[in-house]
Design a protein with these regions (language model features):
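N-terminal and secondary-structure boundary signal
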Residues: 2-212
Length: 212
C-alpha cells in the first residue's frame, strides 16, 4: 500500500517509551508510587525541559502502566520498533517483558537489516534470528526493508540529505519505540534516537549514515 509520509508526520505518529518517556501532567492514582516523574537537574527549568517518567519496576506490568500513563493511545496500524539482537547474544529486550504491551496495542514488531555481514544482514537470516529469540511467539514480525527502501527527507541537511528507510514503514500509522540502553566500544551509546533513526534505516541506509 502506497502512503505518502514526511519526516514530520512520522515523528508525530511515533511514541517513545521505556527508555525515554514524555509524561502527562499528572498520573492516575493507581500508578503513583510505582511510576514517578524524573527529577530536574540543578539549573534546569521545568518549562524548558521534557518530562520523563521512570520506574524501578522493570516488568511487563510496569511497561503497560507507563504506556497508559502517557495518555496517548496507539491507533491504526501499530509498529513496535525494537532491536532483535545478535544471534548468540542476550542484549535485547526479552519477549516476556514486552509481550503484554505489544499484544495490548495489537502491534507488529518491526526491524531492518544490518549494514554489516552477519546473521541479520539478509532478511532470511534476520527472520531466523527473530524466531530464535522468541519474537515470533508473541507477535507478527516485519523486516521493513525486505522489499527495498525509500528516501525520508531530513530537516537539517548539514550531514545528510535524507534517510533511507525500509519501504514497509509506509504501512504503519503509529510507532512505539522500545529501546534498551547499550554501550558501544567506539565511545557512544545506543538508545531511543538511534532506534528510531538508524534503526529504521535499511541496510543501505545504515551504510549511508555511517559514511556521511
Amino acid at each position: 500500500m502506497e502512503k505518502k509520509m514526511t519526516r514530520r508526520s512520522w515523528m508525530k505518529s511515533s511514541l517513545t517509551t521505556l527508555a525515554s518517556l514524555t509524561a502527562v501532567s499528572s498520573l492516575p492514582t493507581s500508578l503513583k508510587g510505582s511510576i514517578m516523574p524524573a527529577k530536574l537537574l540543578a539549573g534546569e527549568s521545568s518549562s524548558s525541559s521534557s518530562k520523563v517518567l521512570m520506574t524501578k519496576n522493570i516488568s511487563s506490568d510496569a511497561l503497560v502502566k507507563i504506556y497508559e500513563a502517557l495518555g496517548r493511545k496507539a491507533s491504526g496500524r501499530v509498529a513496535v520498533k525494537i532491536s532483535t539482537g545478535e544471534p548468540g547474544g542476550h542484549n535485547f529486550l526479552q519477549p516476556s517483558l514486552i509481550k503484554d504491551l505489544v499484544q495490548k496495542v495489537d502491534g507488529t514488531i518491526v526491524e531492518c537489516n544490518t549494514a554489516y555481514a552477519g546473521k541479520r544482514f539478509t532478511t532470511e537470516d534476520h527472520i531466523q534470528a527473530a524466531k530464535d529469540h522468541g519474537f515470533f511467539d508473541i507477535a507478527k514480525v516485519d523486516i521493513m526493508d525486505s522489499e527495498g527502501e525509500f528516501k525520508l527527507p531530513v530537516k537539517d541537511k548539514k550531514h545528510l540529505q535524507y534517510n533511507l528507510v525500509g519501504t514497509h514503514l509506509k504501512n504503519y500509522d503509529f510507532m512505539i519505540n522500545l529501546a534498551h540502553f547499550k554501550g558501544h566500544a567506539m565511545g557512544g551509546f545506543g538508545g531511543v534516537l538511534k532506534n528510531q533513526s538508524i534503526g529504521v534505516a535499511s541496510s543501505k541506509g545504515k551504510a549511508y549514515i555511517h559514511t556521511a
